[in-house]
Amino acid sequence: MQRLPAATRATLILSLAFASLHSACSAEASSSNSSSLTAHHPDPGTLEQCLNVDFCPQAARCCRTGVDEYGWIAAAVGWSLWFLTLILLCVDKLMKLTPDEPKDLQA
């Protein structure tokens, strides 16, 4: 059986680690969001009756924004792993390069 090069093994290990971290984080987020999603669902007809009410403070308390601080951390870790993988692949390619001809040939 042929062994994998070091960069390929490192890429595979980093990819598996990131995938397991991502699945664990998404499972935790979905379990915490499922209980909060059922709480505040008013009837659409009642919102039309309240024309002069400012809903921004209530929306700020009830609705989560797009990405919380853990999401930014996960994105930063994901991108850094991606760039590290690309760097390792480039280093692996550079290590495998061989010159086509010797440097000290007569012109």
Curated annotation (Swiss-Prot):
Q: Which stretches face the Cytoplasmic side?
A: 92-107
Q: Does the record bear Transmembrane helix in its keywords?
A: yes
Signal peptide positions are: 1-27
Subcellular location(s): the record lists: Membrane
GO CC annotation, single: membrane
Q: Which domain of life is it from?
A: Eukaryota
Keyword field contains Membrane: yes
The transmembrane residues are 71-91
Keywords, A to Z, come to: Membrane, Signal, Transmembrane, Transmembrane helix
UniProt name for this protein: Transmembrane protein 213
Originating organism: Homo sapiens (Human)
